[in-house]
UniProtKB/Swiss-Prot annotation:
May interact (via IQ domain) with calmodulin/CALM1 only in the absence of Ca(2+). Interacts with BAX, but not with other Bcl-2 family members. This is GTPase IMAP family member 4. Primarily expressed in spleen, thymus, heart, lung and intestine and, at lower levels, in liver, kidney, stomach and muscle. In the spleen, expressed in periarteriolar lymphatic sheets. In the thymus, detected in the medulla. GTP binds at G37, K38, T39, G40, A41, G42, K43, S44, S45, S58, R155, K156, D157, N191. One of its GO terms (molecular function) is GTP binding. During thymocyte development, may play a role in the regulation of apoptosis. GTPase which exhibits a higher affinity for GDP than for GTP. Residues 1-25 are annotated as: Disordered. Residues 233-262 form the IQ domain. Pfam families: AIG1. It comes from the Eukaryota.
Length: 310
């Protein structure tokens, strides 16, 4: 059975604004996705299916295998696909302080803001406990975040020959209301799928995400926390790049001192030229090393646990 998904609900043009929707990101080389949901919903397996590789630990377990927010990256359709897996931070028994801490880390990993927030819920019995966890999750985001949310229903294979529309007609009313709240944006996933089936459901999900991004005017979700995080990240990235630049200068000075001391004691001009050539090679090698460090400075900052937001 092919993966099924609904179309994206229409958003009236006059109801959109930069403040409500976020910041324009048309032509972005990135597509940033956050996986949200209760422990055991299948977030990590879903992330692996989307990325096409095992980036996150996953398994059948009553306790969350994912302990902190983690990021995986791959390339899809010419874009850098960034997927952030979250632990069961919205489980009803998780303290709000722990939830807030991981939200802060998630913000750092997806700054300047995610294009899609995927709420992962397994098909089957949608319990009162699961509904409470969902409401806790939604309460952590402003209402505008709904425009960036997609309901991702895992364990699609449990449907067997049952049509998804028939299933949803008999689903709990609160689940039907959730689909309506997400403007009828939902997608089915079989995390046991492989090969062509896995690629097809991934394609359909990411097509739905891109369709939603277009409906949102090419914008990504942002709020004051994201704006604050981006400011912190940019500042720390600049500091790290400056540190690497100064470190390169110190390394060049050290290399020059050592070689010039050697060259000064040499009487053979040919040997002097050899040492100068060797010194230039070391200069070039060090420049390449530090250029790569500067290029990766932002990623280092994003992955650090030292980003704190007020």
């Amino acid at each position: 059975m092919e993966a099924q998904y609904s179309g994206v609900g229409s958003i009236p043009e006059n109801s959109r604004s930069s403040h409500e929707l976020g910041i324009q990101d048309q032509g972005s080389p990135q597509l940033r996705i956050v996986l949200l949901g209760k422990t055991g919903a299948g977030k990590s397996s879903t992330g692996n299916s989307i990325l096409g590789r095992k980036a996150f630990l996953s398994g059948i377990c009553a306790k969350s295998i994912t302990k902190v927010c983690e990021k995986g990256v791959s390339i899809w359709d010419g874009k850098e696909l960034v997927v952030v897996d979250t632990p069961g931070i919205f489980d009803t028994e998780v303290p709000d302080a722990d939830t807030q801490k991981e939200i802060t880390r998630c913000v750092a990993l997806t700054s300047p803001g995610p294009h899609a927030l995927l709420l992962v819920i397994p098909l089957g019995c949608y319990t009162v406990e699961e509904h409470k966890a969902t409401r806790k999750l939604l309460s952590m985001f402003e209402k505008k975040a709904r425009r960036f949310m997609i309901l991702l229903l895992t364990r699609k294979d449990d449907l067997e020959d049952t049509d998804i529309h028939e299933y949803l007609e008999t689903a709990p009313e609160v689940l039907q209301e959730l689909i309506y709240e997400f403007r009828n944006r939902y997608c089915l996933f079989n995390n046991k799928a492989s090969g062509a089936e896995q690629e097809e459901q991934k394609r359909q999900l990411l097509t739905l995400v891109q369709s939603m991004v277009r409906e949102n005017g090419g914008k990504y979700f942002t709020n004051k926390m994201y704006e604050s995080a981006e400011g912190v990240i940019q500042k720390q990235t600049w500091k790290k790049k400056e540190f690497y630049r100064e470190e390169l200068e110190r390394e060049r000075a050290r290399i020059r001192r050592e070689y010039e001391a050697e060259i000064q004691d040499l009487r053979d001009e040919l040997e002097r030229e050899r040492r100068r050539a060797r010194m230039e090679r070391e200069f070039n090698e060090n420049e390449l090393i530090f250029a790569e460090r500067q290029q990766n400075a932002r990623r280092e900052v994003e992955n650090t646990s030292m980003i704190y937001l007020n």
